[in-house]
Regions:
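ATP/NTP phosphate-donor binding region
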Residues: 1-78
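Short linear functional motifs in flexible/disordered or boundary regions
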Residues: 25-27, 82, 94, 106
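Short, glycine/charged-enriched secondary-structure capping and boundary segments
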Residues: 28-30, 96-99
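Charge-rich, low-complexity amphipathic helices
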Residues: 37, 59-61, 92, 96, ...
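General beta-strand structural signal in soluble alpha/beta enzymes
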Residues: 45-49, 83-85, 111-113
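Short coil/turn segments at secondary-structure boundaries
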Residues: 57-61, 86, 111
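Long, hydrophobic/aromatic-enriched structural stretches that serve as scaffold segments
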Residues: 67-98
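Short, acidic/small-residue loops that bind anionic groups at enzyme active sites
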Residues: 98-113
């Protein structure tokens, strides 16, 4: 089994919204508070384009856009770990849009969400 590296001091946390984003309250304010906490701990943040989107029905954007965002941010060297910024009830809708072949050959990273 491959184990990802832990989040380094002053590392970068990537945020994605493969399901519900943070476009409405109380999620918007809670996400802003989480960002303040992480930056206060010295971490940099990289927010995906769907984090504040509300273009879908119960999902931040289209399944295609959400799958592409998750693939891009997981495979990116610009962040050390990934966190889903919102809910995950409709994440199953994006699974066939995620490029698992590309993810499989990428350096592993922690993903929570």
């Amino acid at each position: 089994m491959k184990y990802p590296e832990f989040l380094p001091e002053n590392g970068t946390i990537g945020f994605v919204a493969p399901s519900f984003g943070c476009s409405i309250e109380p999620y918007h304010t809670a996400f802003l508070n989480a960002q303040k906490k992480f930056t206060g701990l010295g971490h940099r943040l990289e927010l995906g384009p769907n984090c504040y989107a509300s273009e879908g029905i119960g999902i931040s954007s289209t399944p295609e856009a959400c799958g592409a965002e998750l693939t891009e941010y997981y495979c990116s060297d610009k962040n050390d770990i990934l966190i889903s910024c919102g809910g995950g009830e409709l994440m199953c809708e994006i699974l066939d849009k995620v490029d698992f072949d590309r993810i499989r050959v990428t350096k592993p990273k922690w993903y929570m969400g």
